[in-house]
A protein has these predicted regions:
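Generic structural signal for well-ordered, non-membrane alpha-helical segments
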Residues: 2-5, 44-48, 52, 65, ...
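Redox-cofactor-proximal catalytic regions of oxidoreductases
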Residues: 16-46, 182-185, 191
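Helical element adjacent to the flavin cofactor pocket in flavoenzyme catalytic cores
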Residues: 29-73
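Rossmann-like flavin
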Residues: 1-23
Length: 236
């Protein structure tokens, strides 16, 4: 019933990439918050690549194989299989499967509306982020967006095809949980905001301004940054 609780719920619901008045956005927020209360949101020691390495190791233990640089343009490019799982968008799957998909599925894919994307920035910092809230200084994940109304307004704009002046920014501070992520006394940080589908606008300044708003002096700590647009993230 407090403003802080409403902002916490809104920030978690915003992970849905949907307007916060849509059905099930609150359910997603609760699904994220429950494990956070129990054990926190984990950070992989040594970098996120260690997650991929562990999964590949287990797959190979089970007799599986990983093939890289092997484009799949048709179903005929796949090895013999019982079930195929595609980590692509609907349009790519339709192009690969062609007439193998039922007509009703092809029609559904053709009419599918694309949702917002993400614009991400990674930073190397000369020290920890100087958040005005001491709890944020200790956290590994920080939702930056103001109160619940601010978060809801920003998310609604991205769905409507506009980039808000003050976006909701999801920030991760991995070096808080894993000291191997940065040299002693330094810090690593990444953050992203949602952008309309097809957006080509550079949101770096808007993201950094939002962090600066709640952590004055943040920009003075930036040693280097790597920027990834929605197109870059899709290519990755």
């Amino acid at each position: 019933s407090t403003e802080e609780a409403a902002a916490l719920l809104a920030g978690n619901a915003a992970h849905s990439f949907l307007p916060l008045n849509r059905p099930l956005t609150t359910a997603l927020a609760l699904a994220l918050m429950a494990p956070a209360h129990q054990s926190g949101w984990p950070i992989a020691e040594g970098g996120s690549a260690s997650i991929s390495a562990a999964l590949v190791s287990y797959l190979r233990h089970l007799g599986g194989e990983v093939r890289c640089n092997s484009p799949v343009r048709t179903l005929g490019d796949l090895p013999d299989h019982g079930v195929a799982v595609f980590d692509t968008d609907a349009a790519a799957l339709a192009a690969i499967a062609g007439g193998s998909l039922p007509r009703r599925v092809r029609r559904a894919f053709a009419g599918r509306r694309r949702g917002p994307g993400a614009f991400k920035v990674d930073w190397a910092l000369d020290g920890p982020v100087p958040w005005t809230n001491p709890d944020a200084r200790r956290a590994s994940t920080v939702h930056v967006g103001g109160n619940a109304a601010d978060v809801a307004a920003a998310e609604a704009m991205s769905v409507k095809g506009k980039n808000p002046e003050r976006p909701f920014v999801l920030v991760a501070q991995p070096s808080n949980a894993d000291p191997t992520r940065a040299p002693e006394g330094k810090a690593t940080l990444w953050g992203y905001c949602h952008v309309p589908y097809g957006s080509t606008e550079d949101r770096t300044d808007a993201i950094e301004a939002q962090i600066e708003r709640f952590a004055p002096g943040f920009r003075d700590l930036i040693l280097a940054r790597a920027v990834r647009s929605p197109h870059d993230l899709t290519a990755d």
